[in-house]
Amino acid sequence: MTDRLLVLVRHGQSEWNLKNLFTGWKDPGLTEKGVAEAIEAGKKLKAQGLVFDVAFTSVLTRAQTTLDLMLNELGQTGLPTSKNLALNERDYGDLSGLNKDDARKKWGEEQVHVWRRSYDVPPPGGESLKDTLARALPYYVQEILPCVLRGERTLVAAHGNSLRALIMVLEKLTPESILKRELGTGAPVIYRLNADSTVASKLDLAE
């Protein structure tokens, strides 16, 4: 029987997560806590008896480091890995690098909330969640999903918003539903798919 395994993991806490800054395509590393979260994610996957054939990640350090730390725990450091900006975090444009409280002072609480939580309103010079989906979804359909359907056990380490794009398709969620979905740092979600790419089972290791 083909094991159509897909595991999604948001990167561990980054230095800018800790400082409450908009990060987007900026490239801070992981905090000590973030490193520990990534190692713990690897241990959780190992405890599930999982072995992988292929991995995907973004071009940003925090996701790549998370993947490396997980693979080290799994004893799979040489795993074939594709790195692509399609899996990058949403680009926050002019908000990137700003403290979220400072942004609220500059543009107002309501406007910043709209930029952060609306589906299709981008911040100045940046991407909306809809824009992020527009680059992440084709990559999932063309590159990641075929691996899973071939029975290649697949691990994806990426970002809150690029993973929301994948989850939206996997779980057939509406834009309103996916906006409410919070993804914990370093928390693996294990999917097994049917041959028609629908979800056969889901296990959230954050729970």
UniProtKB/Swiss-Prot annotation:
Keyword Isomerase on entry: yes
Family membership: Belongs to the phosphoglycerate mutase family. BPG-dependent PGAM subfamily.
The entry's keywords: Gluconeogenesis, Glycolysis, Isomerase
NCBIfam families: pgm_1 (TIGR01258), PRK01295.1 (NF002339)
PANTHER family: PHOSPHOGLYCERATE MUTASE
Top-level class of the enzyme under EC nomenclature: isomerase
PROSITE patterns per record: PG_MUTASE
Catalysis performed (reactions): (2R)-2-phosphoglycerate = (2R)-3-phosphoglycerate
Record SUPFAM superfamilies: Phosphoglycerate mutase-like
InterPro entries in UniProt: His_Pase_superF_clade-1 (IPR013078), His_PPase_superfam (IPR029033), PG/BPGM_mutase_AS (IPR001345), Phosphogly_mut1 (IPR005952)
Subunit annotation: Homodimer.
Protein name, as recorded: 2,3-bisphosphoglycerate-dependent phosphoglycerate mutase
Pathway assigned to this chain's UniProt record: Carbohydrate degradation; glycolysis; pyruvate from D-glyceraldehyde 3-phosphate: step 3/5
Molecular function GO labels: phosphoglycerate mutase activity
General function of this protein: Catalyzes the interconversion of 2-phosphoglycerate and 3-phosphoglycerate.
Keyword Transmembrane in record: no
Positions with a binding annotation for substrate: 10-17, 23-24, 62, 89-92, 100, 116-117, 160-161
Source species: Rhodopseudomonas palustris (strain BisB18)
GO annotation terms (biological process): gluconeogenesis; glycolytic process
EC number: 5.4.2.11
Active site: H11 (tele-phosphohistidine intermediate), E89 (proton donor/acceptor)
Gene that produces this protein: gpmA
Site location (Transition state stabilizer): H159
